[in-house]
Structures are given as structure tokens and as C-alpha cells.
Amino acid sequence: MHQLEAERPDRMEEACGVFAVQASEQPVANLAYFGLYALQHRGQESAGIAVFNQGKVRLHKDMGLVSQVFDQDVLARMPGDLAIGHNRYSTTGSSRVCNAQPVVLMTRLGPFALAHNGNLVNAAELRERIDDGQVEFTSTTDSELIAFAVQQAVDRGLDWKAAITSAVSLCQ
């Protein structure tokens, strides 16, 4: 057997689907919808899209397939020029709407949205480090831990790039 063959699984392995888009001339919610639809095989438990518009974020997420979570009325109420979307295949946290992504948090620099595909092996340690008594966890996902790590770094005075770098450095 060749090394390349050994590295390829003989079955499909699932994980969440993440899609982001920035466009000023097109409705990004629609583009994110179609991106998530194309990635739907990656996760079919829940879907969500966060759209940024003039410093504010509009978030819509729910349980179900992309076509069940979003319709044209929902997408029309999500104007903006930047979007991030997520299809969930749960590996950490139960299959409940509170665990649907993206995660949106407020920081001193404004809103922040995060969608994550993967698992943290140090989630328990990261939760202990982040939980300063002020954090109100709303999910059981490790993705929320990353978002709170970014939020705390921003609120300590870091800019976006430094805050994200700091948060990622805590993740294993």
C-alpha cells in the first residue's frame, strides 16, 4: 500500500461546513445560503448565518437543513456586505439549537462572529481559563470557547488581529 492510500480514509468523514463571503454588490446572505447549501453534506443538524451591516450583526440559526432554516423572507431581512455561515455536524456538544453556529459576541470593538469546524483537545482547560465568573456560556460547544477567548483578548485592549492570534494560541 502506498503512503498516500494509507492517509486517505475508505469512507466519508463528516465535519461541520463553514462558508464566508464579502461582497458589496450582491446580497451576501443569499451567497452564504448557497455556499452552505453546497456544503450541506458536511453537516445536516443545524445551519446559521451571521451578516454584518454597518457595524451591526444580524444572526439567524436553527435546527434542520439549510432549506428548512432559511427562506427568501429570512434572507431578505439580512442585508450587509460580509457574512459567515455554518452547517453543524456535532462532535462536541449535543444536537440542540443553542449549539448551532455562528457564535456572535459583543466586544469593545463591536460585534464578533465565529464559525468553527473541528474539535479542541484542550476544551476543558480552555473553559477553566476563560471562566472568570463573568462569562455566560450559552452552549456546550468548544467553538463558543474560542469566541470568548477572542472577546476577552479584545476587551483587554488588543486589536482584532492580535486578539485572534492570542485566542488561537490557546487552542489545541
Provide a role label for each language-model segment:
Residues 1-172:
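Conserved short alpha-helical segments that host acidic/polar catalytic motifs at enzyme active sites
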